[in-house]
Amino acid sequence: MEIYFINPPFKAEFGKFSRESRSPAITKSGALYYPLWLIYAALYSEKNGHKIHFLDAPAKQLNEEQSLEIIQRNENEHSLFVLDTSTPSIKSDVDFAKKIKQLYPKSFITLVGTHPTACAEETLSYSSAVDAIAIGEYDCIIKDLADALEKGENIYTVRGLCLRSDNGYVRTAIMPPMKNLDDLPYAAKFIKEYLNEKDYFFAAATYPSIQIFTGRGCPFRCNFCVYPQTMHGHAFRSRSAENVVGEFEYIANNFQDVKEVVI
């Protein structure tokens, strides 16, 4: 199945909106984090046989019109769209989903990220253009949803979703966190193929840098960080040392300009 992963546009006229930041914002420094959650989900779906498309609108400071023009370069009538979100941008993200649904009424649109995970039913209530919410860590959820849609199977059997029902809304069975993170392909390979490392900036790292995950889950409950409570949980999991070193070697051999790796 064709899956279009999108980091939607938001207030492009003011700068680059860093939706992946702990506190999503357009900053004076121009900080822009890589959309790592989208990247890993796209990689996992591609690894499992699905054809992917990817648009990071903030990275190129694209507005809605420019983003929709790029999206329409592909035949997306029956595609699965996966849109990242954040609390500051949620109303704009839903409006963008509406525009996609108007273009492709037979498509299936799923919202992901911290905000819809925390407020799944409320987010679904914003618009009928949104077909589902993927709750929490969504690599496996999106892959399984794409499998079900492609085969015409009952999507209510897919774990990790919030969907509409005759009685309002229903949450399917919980999708357990991925145990073996070595199953995920290298984010750096995806960045090399689909993105440009010079579009991203992390103030604490020497520019240009690359960001990757070496683990997921955090046992702490810092009141300034939403990710353990919404995305990756409190049980720490890590990639193997060999797997991480392999990605470092890939970066060293394929990104001559990169000065630092942020983990």
Where in the sequence are the language-model features?
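A short acidic, glycine-rich active-site loop
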Residues: 24-35
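Radical SAM [4Fe-4S] cluster-binding motif and immediate context
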Residues: 182, 187-263
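Short glycine/proline- and charge-enriched loop/turn segments
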Residues: 19-26, 225-230
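Short beta-strand segments
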Residues: 4-7, 56, 82-87, 110-112, ...
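N-terminal [4Fe-4S]-dependent radical SAM core
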Residues: 2, 14-18, 25, 164-211
